[in-house]
Each structure stands twice: as C-alpha cells, then as structure tokens.
Amino acid sequence: MAVMDPWLLITIIVGFGMAWAIGANDAANSMSTAVGAKAITPKQAVLIAGVLEFTGAYFFGKSVTETIRKGILYPDRITDPTVLIYGSVAALLAATIWLVIATKFGLPVSTTHSIIGGIVGYGIVYAGFSIVNWGKMTQVVLSWILSPIIGAIMAFLVFKALTKSIFERKDPVRSSKIWSPFWIGLAFVVIGTMFYIKVLHGKSLKTGVLFYGIPAGLVVFLILFLTLRVKFPSSDPFIGVESIFRRVQVITSGYVALAHGANDVANAIGPVAAVYAVATMGMAGMKVPVPRWILAMGGLGIAIGVATYGYRVMETVGKKITELTNTRGFTIDFSAATVVLVASWLGLPISTTHVVVGAVIGVGLARGVKAINKDIVRDIIISWFVTVPVAALISAFLFKILMIVG
C-alpha cells in the first residue's frame, strides 16, 4: 500500500485546511456572543477559544469516527478504496473552499452541511443519485428550517421570562438576588448534562441530568445565592445584573468552545482517518479508528483558524445582527445549549450554527423587529440554503478531475 502514501499526505494537508476553516467560521460562534456583549475582548476570545477547541478535540474527540458523515451515502456502494480516497480529498477541499468564501464575507454557515455537500457531490459523480440516502438528506434540509426557528423561539421566550423576573419587578435588586442564581443555575444544569453527552460522549440522558447537570446547577446556584446576599455588584440594578451575567457568559461561551472541539473536529478528521486506515491497514469500512496525532492535527487546525480568521464571523454574530448585552448573550448561550441538548435526546436534525444565529435573532425580536439587521439576516439565510449545493458542485468537479488524472 506504499502507493497510497502520497495521497495520505495530501489528505492530511487538506484535512488540516478544513480544520482551519472550521475554526475560522464555526468555532468563532462559540465566543461571538461574549465578544458582542463585551464580556471579553476579541484577543481574549481567540485565545480562550483556541485553547478550549484544541482541548476538546484532542482529549475528548471520538477515538472512532465515521468515514462517511451521517450515513449520507450508502457505504456498500463504495467498495474501491481509491474512490474513498479521491472522494475524501474532494469533499474536504470543497467544504474548505466554501467555508473560506463564507468566512471572507463573515457568514456563519454549518461545517457539517459543508462536508455533507462535499460527500454528496463525489457520491453522485461516482454512482449516480441512487447512492445518496435521501431520507438522511431530507433531515439535513429540515435542519435548515427547524434549527433557527426553534433557536429563535427559545431565546425569545427565555429573554422575556428573564427580563420579567428581574428588570420589570418593583425591586430589581432584590429580585436579581433570587432570580439571577436561578437562571444561571438552570443554565449549568444544561451545561453539566451537555458535558456528559457531548464531551464525554455519554449515552444516558438520565445519568447526565442526575449526576452531572443537577449537581453542577445546585453548586452554582448556592454559590451565587449566598454571594449576592452578602454583596451585590452595584447599587444600580441594571449594571449589577449585567455584571453578574458577564462573568458567567465567559464560562458558558468557553463550554461551547470545548464541546465544539470535541464534536465538530470529526468533520475535518473523519475523511483523514478513512484514508489513513486504507493506506496503512487496508481498511475501508463505515467506521475507522482515529490515531491521537490526527485528533491533535484537527484540534491545532481549529485553534489556528479561530486565532487567525475567526474575527469576521465573531463580528457578524456578536455585533451585526442585533445589539447584545451580557444578559442577552447569556440568553443566547443558554437557549442554544438547551435546544441542542433536547434535539440530541429526541434525535432531531439540528445545526448548532443555525440554532445560535436563530437565538441571536430571537433575542433581537424580543426588543422589536427594528432591533434586527434584516439585510444581514437575509444574507445569512441565503448562505445556509446554498451551502450543500455549492459544496456538492465543487466536490463533483474536483472528484471528476481526480478520477481522470489519478
């Protein structure tokens, strides 16, 4: 299998490029609300995100990954290892090209949808439309529609409830001493549960809630409740409440970065692991082992992507859609995490990127339609709908060339 070695090197380079693009676009979402709400500076954001994305990818990334993401193609139709190699390179390169274009314009798009588009493109060229699992593709299309709508509704309702429980009371300071710990504690129930499922890859929601979520939520609630009874951050209730949520927002955003690294690194390393398995062991199955160095490569690529080019998407999500404060940023993080957790439990097709952007829109709508930058929202929605077809077309073209010259 020595003849495969050059293709392994090519795939590693392209996979690293894909990881970089994921960091520049998708990973930037994790810190966008914290930057937009001025909880942290852009420089602090890229440093925190870079470290946590790498940590999530290397230490918590799955040791076994799918060669064909989300079962989007029927694996029994691809028996030739060469096709898998050429297809992996074409899909990775196509997804990378599209992500770089989207990032250039500051458009947050789904990296999962990008790689799915790349896989569909080479699959159709190789074996026709019958190779595509159209049931799975229907789920992908549904996620375009469901994710932002559910995210927006959730954020709208949470923000309305939060403001009513604190800011609209006769004594906001007194109310915030009770309700701030409640909302933040509730958020940590979700974060603790998500840590078990998304980072530790646990299977039981009940175990996650009982042994991770509730203990984390109770500890945070008690610490905040007792602290605020001793000293409130400011005599001005609005400044005081925003100060409380500012500190929490750094933690919630950091968690999102950690979980993103653990999960979405597979979009970059899955095809690399597939080619590595073929080149070194002659394996060409649906699932393949992932060496630690490939996880490290993916994590490093994502971290560098956030640090060098993540500011464009951060600016769009954090500043251009609507004006954010710390309570609004917290609402977005909490709502997005809750929606993703429930969707994972129910098996619903959900895009985290779309949920986050939908939540930003929902928080803006809670203040009225005029609080939303409709031009930016329009551009983002268009970019979502063209992601799969554009990535598919680029991949089809590249795969055809590789099959001819390879």
Swiss-Prot record:
It is a multi-pass membrane protein. GO terms for cellular component: plasma membrane. One of its GO terms (molecular function) is phosphate transmembrane transporter activity. The chain crosses the membrane at residues 2-22, 45-65, 82-102, 115-135, 139-159, 182-202, 208-228, 288-308, 324-346, 385-405. Keywords: Cell membrane, Membrane, Phosphate transport, Transmembrane, Transmembrane helix, Transport. Disulfide bonds: none annotated. The keyword Magnesium does not apply. One of its GO terms (biological process) is phosphate ion transmembrane transport. It is found in: Cell membrane. PANTHER family: PHOSPHATE TRANSPORTER. This is Putative phosphate permease TK2061. It comes from Thermococcus kodakarensis (strain ATCC BAA-918 / JCM 12380 / KOD1). The lineage of its organism: Archaea, Methanobacteriati, Methanobacteriota, Thermococci, Thermococcales.
